[in-house]
């Protein structure tokens, strides 16, 4: 089931195992069980430290990743290929005794959790957000015997996942716990465990502190570190919104990559320099005093720096119409690559006629029964090559001059109301899902009017990435820079870094 290149890479990784690992599989006579057995047999044959046995588990097909004679609580229900193959490899290594690449403070938090925690995560193999959650919960299960975790492929266990319309969907002890991407710190925070503020309070002041973890942040950090400046990053996750991007084909010199690969490479590049990357934590306030610029974190810690570069990026913009908020993750979605497979053979709408909206409609057309694309303007704004491809699809309708007015449904989406701007008539379209692709909303709510914002909530900057507050710079999608592209954000981050360096020299 694995190609030659992947088998070679896996064989090398399995050499890092520090102890024996046993796959305990629950198999039936169905095709998926046969596929799973073939996969596990193929992997087991690659290392003498691996073995395979069979036992009836809660779900079939499924398997646990155990130490001989010891259950770890790590279970995969389905066949973990696609984006989840890395989750399987990491589970094997960690169960074998390989030390995780996680801060000791996080490991200590996991060990201190008391009680019984049985997590179940519903995923799709095309979901780029899902592996982060699966890997975090698997690691927690390996570290703390009070925790167990099962990854469940919704495409295999359709009856269980019938009412799940967004992934990853996490359940704890049978109750809904959370949806969407979550870091291990997010999960711990939801469980009531937070990082000790003293870990941050004892840090020396920085020359440059960068808030945010996306392309602009990474570029800025590398440039300031190369200048010999003491550099820190405060971010929820390295890569930012790019983590949720499927294909990237316009990053010059790289013909094609994915958001997760890009983010992984960015993190590796940052690690090559003396950069204090503090991830899994968010800033909640910023203030300039006579002594320094102070950034307050969500745990109450305060960091000080000579300069700050704000690169907090942007998140999905919502429609802000009745019914939308209460039906998010119940048919209203923002990531077609993650949630598209959950709407197989169903009718969906895509809202937005720009590149993102048209690309989403094209991708979904290959999965769902029918796509209706809504655009408020009189014509689509996407590139012509994308429009041509969209119009060639037989199961896509395009509605321009269409104003969406209400998402219809009780416990899940059943339709959408829209107004024909030409006639003023209102229509109801019955459907199962709505993918919102109307642009991004800058992450500036935490700034509390510390710097000047425009009417769209973006940070106002000049050509040198200065804000209206000396020493505070901004770069990337969080700013009023017109074009929002990865490559432009990276250039902006470098520009902000060089001007921060110049500011420090002159002050």
UniProtKB/Swiss-Prot annotation:
Record: residues binding FAD? 207-222, 467-477
Q: Which GO terms describe its biological process?
A: cell redox homeostasis; response to reactive oxygen species
> One MF term from GO for this chain?
flavin adenine dinucleotide binding
Annotated disulfide bonds: 335-338
Q: Supply one GO CC term from the record.
A: cytosol
Keywords annotated in UniProt: Disulfide bond, FAD, Flavoprotein, NAD, NADP, Oxidoreductase, Redox-active center
Role of this protein = Serves to protect the cell against DNA damage by alkyl hydroperoxides. It can use either NADH or NADPH as electron donor for direct reduction of redox dyes or of alkyl hydroperoxides when combined with the AhpC protein.
The entry sums up its family as follows: Belongs to the class-II pyridine nucleotide-disulfide oxidoreductase family.
What further note is attached to this protein's record?
The active site is a redox-active disulfide bond.
* Descriptive protein name: Alkyl hydroperoxide reductase subunit F
């Amino acid at each position: 089931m694995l190609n030659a290149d992947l088998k070679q890479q896996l064989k090398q990784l399995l050499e890092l195992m520090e102890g024996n690992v046993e796959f305990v599989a629950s198999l039936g006579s169905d095709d998926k069980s046969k596929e799973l057995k073939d996969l596990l047999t193929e992997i087991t044959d690659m290392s003498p430290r691996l073995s395979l046995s069979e036992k009836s588990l809660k779900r079939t097909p499924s398997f646990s990743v155990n130490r001989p004679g010891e259950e770890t609580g790590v279970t995969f229900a389905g066949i973990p290929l696609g984006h989840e193959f890395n989750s399987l490899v990491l589970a094997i290594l960690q169960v074998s005794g390989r030390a995780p690449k996680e801060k000791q403070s996080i490991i200590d938090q996991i060990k201190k959790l008391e009680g019984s925690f049985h997590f179940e995560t519903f995923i799709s193999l095309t979901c780029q957000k899902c592996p982060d959650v699966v890997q975090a919960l698997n690691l927690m299960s390996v570290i703390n015997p009070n925790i167990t975790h099962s990854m469940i492929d919704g495409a295999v266990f359709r009856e269980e996942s019938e009412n799940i319309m967004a992934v990853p969907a996490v359940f704890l002890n049978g109750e809904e716990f959370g949806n969407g991407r979550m870091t291990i710190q997010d999960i711990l925070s939801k469980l009531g465990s937070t990082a000790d503020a003293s870990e941050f309070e004892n840090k020396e002041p920085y020359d440059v502190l960068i808030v945010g973890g996306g392309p602009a942040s990474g570029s800025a950090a590398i440039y300031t570190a190369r200048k010999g400046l003491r550099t820190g990053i405060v971010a929820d996750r390295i890569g930012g919104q790019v983590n949720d991007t499927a294909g990237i084909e316009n990053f010059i010199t790289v013909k094609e990559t994915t958001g997760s690969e890009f983010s992984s490479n960015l993190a590796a590049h940052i690690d090559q320099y003396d950069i204090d990357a503090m991830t899994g934590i968010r800033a909640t306030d910023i203030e300039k005093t006579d002594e320094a610029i102070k950034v307050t974190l969500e745990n109450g810690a305060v960091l000080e720096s000579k300069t700050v570069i704000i690169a907090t990026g942007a998140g999905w913009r919502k429609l802000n119409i009745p019914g939308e908020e209460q039906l998010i993750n119940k048919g209203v979605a923002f990531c077609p690559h993650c949630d598209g497979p959950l709407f197989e053979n169903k009718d969906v709408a895509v809202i937005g006629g720009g590149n993102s909206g048209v690309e989403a409609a094209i991708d979904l057309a290959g999965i769902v029964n029918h796509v209706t694309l809504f655009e408020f303007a009189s014509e689509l704004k996407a590139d012509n090559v994308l429009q041509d491809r969209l119009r060639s699809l037989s199961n896509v309708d395009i509605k321009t001059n269409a104003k969406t007015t209400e998402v219809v449904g009780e416990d899940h989406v059943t339709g959408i109301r829209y107004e024909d701007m030409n006639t003023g008539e209102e229509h109801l379209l019955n459907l199962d899902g709505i993918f919102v692709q109307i642009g991004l909303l800058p992450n500036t709510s935490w700034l509390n009017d510390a710097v000047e914002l425009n009417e769209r909530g973006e940070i106002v900057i000049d050509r040198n990435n200065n804000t209206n507050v000396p020493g505070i710079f901004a770069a990337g999608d969080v700013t009023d820079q017109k074009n929002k592209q990865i490559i432009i954000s990276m250039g902006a981050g470098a520009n902000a870094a060089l001007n921060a360096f110049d500011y420090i020299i002159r002050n």
